[in-house]
């Protein structure tokens, strides 16, 4: 079932992780600590860079986040792959939000560029995905370009993020 809300708080995201937002067998977010954002600030089926829809989210950076003590000892940095995973998570959420059925899985991405780091000194990470295409066939496939901003500065870019929703065969 397509959603009508355009923003989601942390409790909504936890409901999605439990499979309660889009219904049984449909798109879910991972549960913490792998849930990589605290809120979805805006989602729309229209607009964005390509006019096919977009989603925006934020993560509040706290020095005690689980990855800082181990990546790296004495030099804490958020792993870049977690920022990339957040963009895949958002793309899957977008497909579920559209009302598309199936369980979400990251498939691939094109080019990824990192030009900065998320350290404990950062206050807020903003994420964005602009959808280029949603294909509906044996699976539902979302393709988009994404970015990550640390305190307003764009430091990650990813092109051609691909997420599929797969229906379970009986």
From Swiss-Prot:
A GO CC term attached to the entry: cytoplasm
Question: Its Enzyme Commission number?
Answer: 4.2.1.59, 5.3.3.14
The cysteines joined by S-S bonds are: none
UniProt keyword Isomerase, yes or no = yes
Q: Show which residues constitute the signal peptide.
A: none
* Entry keyword annotation includes Disulfide bond: no
Q: What reactions does this protein catalyze?
A: a (3R)-hydroxyacyl-[ACP] = a (2E)-enoyl-[ACP] + H2O; (3R)-hydroxydecanoyl-[ACP] = (2E)-decenoyl-[ACP] + H2O; (2E)-decenoyl-[ACP] = (3Z)-decenoyl-[ACP]
Q: Which GO terms describe its molecular function?
A: (3R)-hydroxyacyl-[acyl-carrier-protein] dehydratase activity; trans-2-decenoyl-acyl-carrier-protein isomerase activity
Q: In which pathway does it act?
A: Lipid metabolism; fatty acid biosynthesis
Q: Which UniProt keywords apply?
A: Cytoplasm, Fatty acid biosynthesis, Fatty acid metabolism, Isomerase, Lipid biosynthesis, Lipid metabolism, Lyase
List the InterPro entries hit by this protein, alphabetically. Answer: FabA, FabA_FabZ, HotDog_dom_sf
Assembly with partners or alone: Homodimer.
Task: Please describe what this protein does.
Answer: Necessary for the introduction of cis unsaturation into fatty acids. Catalyzes the dehydration of (3R)-3-hydroxydecanoyl-ACP to E-(2)-decenoyl-ACP and then its isomerization to Z-(3)-decenoyl-ACP. Can catalyze the dehydratase reaction for beta-hydroxyacyl-ACPs with saturated chain lengths up to 16:0, being most active on intermediate chain length.
Q: Which family is it part of?
A: Belongs to the thioester dehydratase family. FabA subfamily.
Name the UniProt record assigns to this protein: 3-hydroxydecanoyl-[acyl-carrier-protein] dehydratase
